[in-house]
Amino acid sequence: MHVDDFIEQMGRFHEGFDAKRAKRLAKAFDLDVKAKTGALSTGYRTICQLVLALSLDADYLLLDEPVLGLDAAHRELFYQLLMEDYLERPRTVVIATHLIEEVANLVERVTIIDEGRVLMQASADELRSSGYSVSGRAADVRAYCEGLDVLDVDELGGVAVAYLLGTPDAERLNDRLDTAPVNLQKLFVKLTEKGE
């Protein structure tokens, strides 16, 4: 079956499907609508699925690893088109992904799930400010961390970086310690590694 056949069939099966939009999106991605779907590369199969999904008029859009197999340019294009789509027609979009930093600026709420358990759920801004790192001499870092909610400590050659939940404790800090925010990707990794 060819890509344009898929587009035509989707229009028959889904009342809210916009075939014109699908063709515009296919063109934006340089997806050959005359190509057989079985001959498409992994990336272009993903693009074909995204074109179909973004052309549906649905209140909820669920995307599981939507950029799997896409190169960096196509991933950026997808995120741009997803935002344009949302601005034209606001709806709930759920994205399951391991490429957290790529979607960090697109999302309003984040749920971190590990092995079926919800570890954290909050607005993206709340999650961004929920963790931090402290680095310095290992002995100073260990002393700082005593009694705090430590996710993990990376240590190498007498220097350590600790990842913690909460906000820096100014009373514990000294001029030998540095603090920094933890991005969502690092927070996800450290939360899901905890206890391993």
Annotate the PLM regions.
Residues M1-C48:
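ABC-family P-loop ATPase nucleotide-binding domains
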Residues D4-D5, E76, Q80:
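Surface-exposed alpha-helical interface segments used for non-catalytic interactions
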Residues D57:
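Conserved catalytic motifs of ABC-family nucleotide-binding domains
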Residues L61-E65, L70:
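Catalytic Walker B motif of ABC-type/P-loop ATPase nucleotide-binding domains
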Residues A72-H74:
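Helix N-cap at the start of a conserved alpha-helix in ABC-type nucleotide-binding domains
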Residues F78-L164:
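ABC transporter nucleotide-binding domain
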Residues D152, L156-E196:
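C-terminal coupling/interaction segments
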